[in-house]
Amino acid sequence: PDENSFDAEQESKFLKEKSESENEIEIIAVVDNVVAGTAGIEAVGTKYKVKHRAELGISVAKEFWGLGIGWALMNACIECARNAGYVQLELNVVAENTRAIAMYERAGFVEYGRNPKGFQSRKTGFQELIYMKMEL
Protein backbone atom coordinates (compact mmCIF):
# COMPACT_ATOMS: atom_id res chain seq x y z
CA PRO A 1 0.00 0.00 0.00
CA ASP A 2 2.91 2.33 0.76
CA GLU A 3 4.10 2.25 -2.85
CA ASN A 4 0.85 1.67 -4.71
CA SER A 5 0.46 4.48 -7.21
CA PHE A 6 -1.82 2.86 -9.81
CA ASP A 7 -5.16 4.42 -10.55
CA ALA A 8 -8.09 2.16 -11.51
CA GLU A 9 -7.28 2.31 -15.23
CA GLN A 10 -3.61 1.45 -14.71
CA GLU A 11 -4.50 -1.40 -12.35
CA SER A 12 -6.97 -2.76 -14.91
CA LYS A 13 -4.30 -2.65 -17.64
CA PHE A 14 -1.76 -4.37 -15.34
CA LEU A 15 -4.18 -7.19 -14.49
CA LYS A 16 -5.19 -7.61 -18.15
CA GLU A 17 -1.54 -7.96 -19.19
CA LYS A 18 -0.94 -10.55 -16.47
CA SER A 19 -4.05 -12.51 -17.46
CA GLU A 20 -2.85 -12.67 -21.07
CA SER A 21 0.72 -13.67 -20.19
CA GLU A 22 1.86 -17.25 -20.69
CA ASN A 23 4.53 -17.10 -17.98
CA GLU A 24 3.39 -14.51 -15.43
CA ILE A 25 0.36 -14.34 -13.17
CA GLU A 26 -1.33 -12.11 -10.61
CA ILE A 27 -3.86 -13.62 -8.20
CA ILE A 28 -6.23 -11.66 -5.99
CA ALA A 29 -7.81 -13.22 -2.89
CA VAL A 30 -11.19 -11.71 -2.01
CA VAL A 31 -13.10 -12.34 1.24
CA ASP A 32 -16.60 -10.87 1.60
CA ASN A 33 -15.94 -8.45 -1.28
CA VAL A 34 -12.72 -7.20 0.36
CA VAL A 35 -9.29 -7.75 -1.17
CA ALA A 36 -7.56 -9.92 1.43
CA GLY A 37 -4.34 -10.54 -0.47
CA THR A 38 -2.50 -10.62 -3.75
CA ALA A 39 0.28 -12.76 -5.15
CA GLY A 40 2.09 -13.13 -8.40
CA ILE A 41 5.01 -14.52 -10.30
CA GLU A 42 7.06 -12.46 -12.69
CA ALA A 43 9.91 -13.42 -14.98
CA VAL A 44 13.33 -12.33 -13.73
CA GLY A 45 14.19 -11.56 -17.36
CA THR A 46 13.80 -12.67 -20.95
CA LYS A 47 17.46 -13.33 -21.77
CA TYR A 48 18.48 -17.00 -22.02
CA LYS A 49 20.74 -16.80 -18.98
CA VAL A 50 17.89 -15.80 -16.62
CA LYS A 51 14.64 -16.87 -18.29
CA HIS A 52 14.50 -20.05 -16.17
CA ARG A 53 13.92 -17.89 -13.05
CA ALA A 54 10.78 -16.23 -11.71
CA GLU A 55 10.16 -14.01 -8.71
CA LEU A 56 7.29 -14.59 -6.29
CA GLY A 57 5.54 -11.81 -4.42
CA ILE A 58 2.79 -12.21 -1.81
CA SER A 59 0.92 -9.70 0.30
CA VAL A 60 -1.90 -10.48 2.74
CA ALA A 61 -3.74 -7.77 4.69
CA LYS A 62 -3.03 -8.08 8.41
CA GLU A 63 -6.69 -8.64 9.35
CA PHE A 64 -6.63 -11.80 7.20
CA TRP A 65 -3.44 -13.34 8.65
CA GLY A 66 -3.73 -16.86 10.02
CA LEU A 67 -6.53 -17.94 7.67
CA GLY A 68 -4.36 -19.83 5.17
CA ILE A 69 -4.72 -17.19 2.46
CA GLY A 70 -0.96 -16.69 2.08
CA TRP A 71 -0.43 -20.46 1.90
CA ALA A 72 -3.11 -20.84 -0.78
CA LEU A 73 -1.78 -17.92 -2.83
CA MET A 74 1.79 -19.19 -2.57
CA ASN A 75 0.89 -22.73 -3.65
CA ALA A 76 -1.16 -21.46 -6.59
CA CYS A 77 1.84 -19.39 -7.71
CA ILE A 78 4.23 -22.32 -7.30
CA GLU A 79 1.96 -24.46 -9.48
CA CYS A 80 1.75 -21.70 -12.10
CA ALA A 81 5.54 -21.31 -12.08
CA ARG A 82 6.00 -25.04 -12.67
CA ASN A 83 3.39 -25.03 -15.44
CA ALA A 84 5.13 -22.07 -17.09
CA GLY A 85 8.37 -24.06 -17.19
CA TYR A 86 10.38 -22.12 -14.65
CA VAL A 87 13.21 -24.00 -12.93
CA GLN A 88 13.76 -21.67 -9.98
CA LEU A 89 11.36 -19.50 -7.98
CA GLU A 90 12.84 -16.65 -5.93
CA LEU A 91 11.58 -14.18 -3.36
CA ASN A 92 12.80 -11.69 -0.82
CA VAL A 93 11.29 -11.09 2.58
CA VAL A 94 11.97 -8.64 5.41
CA ALA A 95 13.93 -10.50 8.10
CA GLU A 96 11.45 -9.43 10.80
CA ASN A 97 8.57 -11.16 8.98
CA THR A 98 9.03 -14.46 10.79
CA ARG A 99 5.52 -15.71 9.93
CA ALA A 100 6.18 -15.43 6.20
CA ILE A 101 9.67 -16.92 6.52
CA ALA A 102 8.27 -19.96 8.35
CA MET A 103 5.63 -20.41 5.63
CA TYR A 104 8.22 -20.18 2.86
CA GLU A 105 10.52 -22.66 4.60
CA ARG A 106 7.62 -25.07 5.15
CA ALA A 107 6.96 -24.92 1.40
CA GLY A 108 10.60 -25.71 0.59
CA PHE A 109 12.22 -22.31 0.05
CA VAL A 110 15.78 -21.95 1.34
CA GLU A 111 17.73 -18.83 2.24
CA TYR A 112 20.63 -17.96 -0.05
CA GLY A 113 21.60 -14.47 1.04
CA ARG A 114 20.86 -11.29 2.98
CA ASN A 115 20.99 -7.57 2.38
CA PRO A 116 21.19 -5.53 5.62
CA LYS A 117 19.68 -2.42 4.01
CA GLY A 118 17.65 -4.14 1.31
CA PHE A 119 14.30 -2.58 2.24
CA GLN A 120 13.48 0.95 3.30
CA SER A 121 10.23 1.66 5.09
CA ARG A 122 8.84 5.15 5.54
CA LYS A 123 7.85 4.12 9.06
CA THR A 124 10.81 2.08 10.34
CA GLY A 125 13.76 2.98 8.13
CA PHE A 126 16.10 0.34 6.72
CA GLN A 127 15.34 -3.33 7.22
CA GLU A 128 17.27 -6.47 6.36
CA LEU A 129 16.05 -8.54 3.42
CA ILE A 130 16.41 -12.30 3.20
CA TYR A 131 16.72 -13.80 -0.28
CA MET A 132 15.12 -17.22 -0.68
CA LYS A 133 14.73 -19.66 -3.57
CA MET A 134 13.01 -22.90 -4.46
CA GLU A 135 14.09 -25.36 -7.12
CA LEU A 136 11.00 -26.41 -9.05
Regions found by a protein language model. Give the residues of each.
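Conserved active-site alpha-helix within GNAT-family acetyltransferase domains
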Residues: 67, 71, 83, 96-113
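Acetyl-CoA-dependent GNAT
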Residues: 3-63, 74, 80, 135-136
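Terminal substrate-recognition subdomain of acyl/acetyltransferases
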Residues: 126-136
